[in-house]
Amino acid sequence: MAVSGLRLTIVWGLLVLILTCQADDKPEGKPDEQPHDSGKNSEPAFPKFLNILGSDIIENAVEFILRSMTRSTEFLEHGDKQGEHSSK
């Protein structure tokens, strides 16, 4: 179950990163229709939202992986201690 959740998190994170990278690209052959005004923010809010969402997904995935690794090492350490106690 944990492996499938990890895979799903990785796939979603990569998908969001790809979408945010593609959202910033302009189609080839089409020039900018709007002139650049120094006073206006030319960056749309939707790709920024996707960028933040992708960053959160990646941070959560890394936190999940690290938490899983510490749990598995704690489990192995406790398993070794139980094995020592049972042999006494």
Swiss-Prot record:
Its GO CC terms?
A: extracellular region
Q: Where is this region: Disordered?
A: 25-45
Q: Where is the composition biased (Basic and acidic residues)?
A: 25-40
- Where does this polypeptide localize? Secreted
The domain of life is Eukaryota
Q: Where is the signal peptide?
A: 1-23
Q: Which keywords does this chain's UniProt record carry?
A: Secreted, Signal
Location, primary (coarse class): secreted
| Pfam families with a match to the protein in the record | DUF4576
Its name, as the record gives it, is Uncharacterized protein C5orf46 homolog
Q: Which organism is it from?
A: Bos taurus
**Upper taxonomic classification of the species?**
Eukaryota, Metazoa, Chordata, Craniata, Vertebrata
